[in-house]
Amino acid sequence: MDLRSALEKTNIIKSYKLHFLIRYTTSRFEVKEPFLAYLHMARQKDKLLPKCITPPNKKADPFTNDVSSYFTHTHTHTPCSPSLVYTYVNTTEKSPSKSPKHKNILPFNFTK
């Protein structure tokens, strides 16, 4: 699926995620805009899962607990599939920003 087709589904994913946050959480959340990433499609023989993602513009990729990480652009990569990565961060409780419960990244695979 190309970038245009994936981005057309952004509003559907956004609406679903906002509904989920309103319906199933009791805390206030800052919901960040979704962005497209290319996730590695691992073969069974792969011992390690290489992260086939677009280059982040800051110190770490979005699969870490660094809430400031995000992508500058996307690119196609043959063994990878496009996914929309949605980030939301709990803004009420005061604990370390790198705490896993304050950073949730959910990939949505458009190839299925």
UniProtKB/Swiss-Prot annotation:
InterPro entries: DUF468 (IPR007414). Residues 93-112 are annotated as: Disordered. Transmembrane segments: none annotated. It comes from the Eukaryota. Pfam families: DUF468. Coiled coil: none annotated. Belongs to the UPF0320 family. Contained within a telomeric X element core sequence. This is Putative UPF0320 protein YEL074W. It comes from Saccharomyces cerevisiae (strain ATCC 204508 / S288c).
